[in-house]
Amino acid sequence: MLTNKGKNIMNSQLVDKFFEAMSNSDVDTAMSVLHDDCVNHDMGSGQVMRGIEENRADMENWTNTFSDMKVEPLNHVESGDTVVTEMKMTGVNTGDMEMPDGSKIPATGKRVEMQGCQVAQFQDGKMIKASQYYNMMTMMAQLGLMPE
């Protein structure tokens, strides 16, 4: 049950703003959506980013790895201060991909397309917690880094 429809609409609009900023490699605008204490769980890689600087570094890694990356929200489901978003990400791997252990995989020049889901919680008009769910193996197979 939606307890505050106006607030939820604002929260889903913030998710849209965040994804649009990612799609435009506009890291500053994306960071403006995040709470200073935002914790971001990347379930595909197993990484956890805490605070603005770690989230900024993560987003810069994604936008450098996929210079033409587009993140498209397909559907929002909202309840209270939580927004669940189905999303589609596309991009061409034009830059080295930094892995969680700090190693780098050279660019493949291959295109990826994958769907996933983000669960985001909001506090004080900012994203305080987010978890992205996607299949890392799908992405690695599309990049030619493992058998399909």
What residue ranges belong to the model's regions?
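C-terminal and inter-domain tail/linker signature
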Residues: L2-E148
